[in-house]
A protein has these predicted regions:
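Acidic (Asp/Glu)-rich catalytic clusters
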Residues: 73-81, 114-117, 146, 168-174
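Active-site mouth loops of central-metabolism enzymes
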Residues: 24-38, 92-103, 132
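Short acidic capping loops at alpha-helix termini that bridge into adjacent secondary structure
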Residues: 14-15, 80-83, 87, 119-123, ...
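Beta/alpha (TIM)-barrel catalytic core signal, keyed to glycine-rich beta->alpha loops juxtaposed to Asp/Glu
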Residues: 133-313, 323
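Active-site groove signature of glycoside hydrolases
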Residues: 114-131
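Active-site beta-loop-alpha junctions enriched in small/polar residues
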Residues: 21-23, 58-60, 88-92, 126-129, ...
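Short, acidic/polar
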Residues: 33-47, 100-116, 164-169
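N-terminal binding-site loop/beta-alpha segment at the start of enzyme catalytic domains
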Residues: 1-83
Length: 324
């Protein structure tokens, strides 16, 4: 495993981040495919043994049970100072309504720390933009969380670049804790972030930690081949259903490059992301140890300029999806 500074912070993270949406009690969330605790723990332990030290969860994943499972596993398999733990606030959890008001943020971080069994998180991210709360209230509350020692740093997730620029400017003007990461939707078949968000992040020293780096499994198998999870994944369908013809050509080129390198499609798709300036750690979501073992090899894979061009050439602009 290789490690990199997380933007302009003192944190050093593995080049792959373990996404923890996969972990959660199936009867407590919206996704029947999540792994219960007895299946999650071996995978988390295997990730640690493979060199991953960066874990991304959220208050809302499986109604909080993801944080509970991840927290217990990390306490058992690693020292607190050996791991970088990220969680999120915004979506509804139990009787805590959706939103980013001061009251919601302060309650959410306390609830997350209780579920995780930790005194602090390394990174607290806002999961989406809250149109019902003044952004100044949100940013000042996040600063309060950092000053209280409950989060070392703060980050943001999918939003318009103009919104992120506004937030960064307000943080600088008011001396508030600044966003150090952008958790955005970015992969070989969705590259709209390259237009504005990625350049903005590079100018401001913000680390990019992409979600859905394998397009929710679409970049791991022949185009059109399906799985039970793909069939039931309504959110995934909303992300990719309008661009399948163009995406199929990219998938075909991905298969060609993978064959040239004697690598898996997933390894090549991740290696492409890792080659992008500003990308710190794509967030992967394996559900089996053999999948994780395959993905871990991506950090040692180097693509030639010709291979990168072959992967990128077919891309055409896509509708902006994943947030409002």
């Amino acid at each position: 495993m290789h490690y990199i500074p997380l933007g302009d912070t003192a944190l050093r993270v593995s080049r792959l981040c373990l996404g923890c949406m996969t972990f959660g009690e199936p009867d407590r969330g919206r996704h029947a495919w999540t792994l219960p605790e007895e299946s999650s723990r071996p995978l988390i332990q295997h990730a640690i043994e493979g060199g991953i030290n960066f874990f991304d969860t959220a208050n809302s994943y499986s109604d909080g049970s993801s944080e509970e499972i991840v927290g217990r596993a990390l306490r058992d398999f690693a020292r607190r100072d050996e791991v970088v733990v990220a969680t999120k606030v915004y979506h509804q959890v139990g009787d805590l309504a959706e939103g980013l008001s001061r009251a919601q943020i302060l309650r959410s971080i306390d609830d997350s720390l209780r579920r995780l069994g930790m005194d602090y998180v390394d990174l607290l991210q806002i999961h989406r933009w809250d149109y019902s709360t003044p952004i100044e209230e949100t940013l000042e509350a996040l600063d309060e969380v950092v000053k209280a020692g409950k989060a070392r740093y703060i980050g943001a997730s999918s939003m318009h670049a103009r919104q992120f620029a506004q937030a960064l400017a307000l943080q600088q003007q008011n001396g508030w804790a600044r966003f150090v990461t952008m958790h955005d939707h970015y992969n070989l078949i969705y590259r709209e972030e390259e237009n504005e968000m990625l350049p903005l992040c590079q100018r401001n020293g913000v680390a990019v930690i992409p979600w859905s780096p394998l397009a929710r499994g679409r970049l791991t198998r022949p185009w059109g081949e399906t799985t039970a999870r793909l069939v039931s994944d309504e959110f995934g369908k909303s992300l990719y259903s309008t661009s399948e013809e163009n995406d199929a050509q990219i998938s075909g080129n991905l298969a060609d490059v993978a064959e040239e390198l004697d690598a898996s499609r997933a390894q090549v798709a991740l290696a492409w992301l890792l080659s992008k300036p500003g990308v710190a750690a794509p967030i992967i979501g394996p559900s089996r140890q053999e999948q994780l073992d395959d993905l871990l090899q991506a950090v040692d894979l180097t693509l030639s300029p010709e291979q990168i061009d072959k992967l990128e050439a077919p891309y055409q602009p896509h509708p902006v999806v994943g947030f409002k």
